[in-house]
Amino acid sequence: MAELPQSRINERNITSEMRESFLDYAMSVIVSRALPDVRDGLKPVHRRILYGLNEQGMTPDKPYKKSARIVGDVMGKYHPHGDSSIYEAMVRMAQDFSYRYPLVDGQGNFGSMDGDGAAAMRYTEARMTKITLELLRDINKDTIDFIDNYDGNEREPSVLPARFPNLLVNGAAGIAVGMATNIPPHNLTEVIDGVLSLSKNPDITINELMEDIQGPDFPTAGLVLGKSGIRRAYETGRGSIQMRSRAEIEERGGGRQRIVVTEIPFQVNKARMIEKIAELVRDKKIDGITDLRDETSLRTGVRVVIDVRKDANASVILNNLYKQTPLQTSFGVNMIALVNSRPKLINLKEALIHYLEHQKTVVRRRTEYNLKKARDRAHILEGLRIALDHIDEIITTIRESDTDKIAMASLQERFKLTERQAQAILDMRLRRLTGLERDKIESEYNELLEYIKELEEILADEEVLLQLVRDELTEIKERFGDERRTEIQLGGLEDLEDEDLIPEEQIVITLSHNNYIKRLPVSTYRSQNRGGRGIQGMNTLDEDFVSQLVTMSTHDHVLFFTNKGRVYKLKGYEVPELSRQSKGIPIINAIELENDETISTMIAVKDLESEEDYLVFATKQGIVKRSSLSNFSRINKNGKIAINFKEDDELIAVRLTTGNEDILIGTAHASLIRFSESTLRPLGRTAAGVKGISLREGDTVVGLDVADSESEDEVLVVTENGYGKRTPVSEYRLSNRGGKGIKTATITERNGNIVCITTVTGEEDLMVVTNAGVIIRLDVHDISQNGRAAQGVRLMKLGDGQFVSTVAKVNEEDDNEENADEAQQSTTTETADVEEVVDDQTPGNAIHTEGDAEMESVESPENDDRIDIRQDFMDRVNEDIESASDNEEDSDE
């Protein structure tokens, strides 16, 4: 290999060379390639393309020209970095889904939202759009500086005049070395309004600017969730903006629904989005979608249709799609731009300030340019006026001169003209000597004097110049402004919570004696007449039965209070949904109970942070406590202490109150006390309580409930042998806390001890559960209303060894679909979906309910009617006796 001359070899330390070369490369990428200028919002390649279009005269009123010609001209003169980078940049400026206000008017295939590439440059054509002219307007009036191109043979603009704030209007994106920029597009009208507000009030705050500029306005429309991310980005230059597709749930007949997506987030590839949805359906990560198709067309615009299965919840599916697909995504704002050729992170106000200063400079330089031209023209017109006033002498002087140089010198000397004026006279045509031409020159001269005066006023007064900037921006806003496309949903959301992905529905949560828990839809249990046999609520294990149930929404909290005075918390949807006959799962799989700990009460709560609600506790030994509900808002997985009491005591029940109610405590031996809740001072979460009722020997508390002081509610009493009654609350007078209470029922061997004392309004249904797991749902109106001393009427027929274990209230629901199912069952002999009941004689065997003559004959309803008539007579006798015994019981208190 031939040796190079010594003069061409420079020895350098490789570390220094690498450091300096990389810095040079990094600065070249930052300043000359990847970042936009804060003044015109353009990177060098975009600026060179637009200037090249302007130089070729490819204005909107001219025919399209081949893209290859444009690319070749730009590459040869200004941008020697390959044709692909130039063409790709030009294609993006022509895409109405990439630019809010496209700067290139393309003809041919310029790509699609599905990620399809544009046709080759030899097939497509392009020219400028009308709004692009505003970026280049006045470029030839010395409004901006020109610099040498890469080889020094051409001149190119260092920045465009940019008569509208393109940096914010169309946004920008670029990756440099060690930094990147990502600026969202905005609405032209809003941004110009922001510039106008800033020009009138330099001390304006970003919050005030946001009254004009609501937020990004993406070309693909869609939704922006909340303003917190927008405000953070505008204040600091960095932030995350949540974008969401616009989707509607439509009915498509037959009770079926479809999800129709008509707008998608900015920069989302529609085809890949659809592929992602299909992938999730295929992998069974999203259930309930039966069909997925893209119906997008030029006529309808974006339209992606998702058919939903009849039994699926379209809202839940849509929320799952938001969470797991690009139907919802974020836009990371990073407002870095070149300020004085240096990269800088700017906020919204700074971006507008730099643009406004640029416009003031452009208008000032244009005014100076126009003033210079006007003065030059006025100077020429002054010479022409002199010539017209002395036309004969001028002609004589010219005729006497041998050459044009002598003539020019003679005119300058004799009429005191400048060289330019003398040249203009020599160049003047003879037709200018007519009277009409003389008037035109005079008129033009006077107009020029006025124009010069106006230009001088603009340069002399900053406010006049600023007003001119405002007027020109307003004119652009009126010409090109349009309505906002992207809707900003105030209040917004950040991340989708679990509740958003789970349908909200009314459920029943049941808990068995052996602590097995499950949930079922509340519609599983249909309402029956009093005395019915009920439906099988679960297949219980030996010596196990349903002990508690509560109705709530899947989105509500359920608090579990244990016999040891501890509290645990779950969401409704966190309890597994199982079949009606399923025994459930062990409660210890859901919450971490301690040894020998059982659930005393389950309470459904919507808002645990409420400061206006309270919890009232009652123990087996008659102790009560009131505590604010907000004390229980932070319950961890291991639970917390809810109440402290003695070792021989245990928690019986807990009730949710408003703080202004009356407390009712009932015992197994039919004593009931009513006192005002206000007599209970609110205590802390771990505090012990005070005496609520004085118990007779062998008696224990079995029920706790609350009622309004002027309540028209009724006290419902249910005994262990399936009897019950309703008694108005008003029959239980208010007394002092700690008394023995008054009689609430007559206890006999026939009806047994009381297992439930609660209040009802008459608008509820009643769930009565036996130790065998049989559940019956009754309308409260079907239960007779009796006095305090009555035994009650039969609510439920019990088999041998069966007794009522628990009772719960269920709100009535007008379920047309359920009623329709019942009607269908009454007219068909057999259906796979019919509900089943349990025969007392053969527990667990399924038979049909209403209208079964065989069952009626077995149970001898005539005998039951005679028993009920006799019982009603005895109840009336007991009511007469009761009034006589009240005074005696009052004295016991």
Swiss-Prot record:
Keywords assigned: ATP-binding, Cytoplasm, DNA-binding, Isomerase, Nucleotide-binding, Topoisomerase
GO molecular function, one term: ATP binding
Classification via SUPFAM superfamilies: GyrA/ParC C-terminal domain-like, Type II DNA topoisomerase
PROSITE patterns according to UniProt: TOPO_IIA
Domain Topo IIA-type catalytic: 35-501
Keyword Transferase: no
Gene3D superfamilies: 3.30.1360.40, DNA gyrase/topoisomerase IV, subunit A, C-terminal, Topoisomerase II, domain 5, Topoisomerase, domain 3
Catalytic activity: ATP-dependent breakage, passage and rejoining of double-stranded DNA
Pfam families (alphabetical): DNA_gyraseA_C (PF03989), DNA_topoisoIV (PF00521)
Role played: A type II topoisomerase that negatively supercoils closed circular double-stranded (ds) DNA in an ATP-dependent manner to modulate DNA topology and maintain chromosomes in an underwound state. Negative supercoiling favors strand separation, and DNA replication, transcription, recombination and repair, all of which involve strand separation. Also able to catalyze the interconversion of other topological isomers of dsDNA rings, including catenanes and knotted rings. Type II topoisomerases break and join 2 DNA strands simultaneously in an ATP-dependent manner.
NCBIfam families hit by this protein: gyrA, PRK05560.1, PRK05561.1
The protein's name in its UniProt record: DNA gyrase subunit A
Species whose genome carries this gene: Staphylococcus epidermidis (strain ATCC 35984 / DSM 28319 / BCRC 17069 / CCUG 31568 / BM 3577 / RP62A)
The organism's taxonomic lineage, starting at the top: Bacteria, Bacillati, Bacillota, Bacilli, Bacillales
Record gene name: gyrA
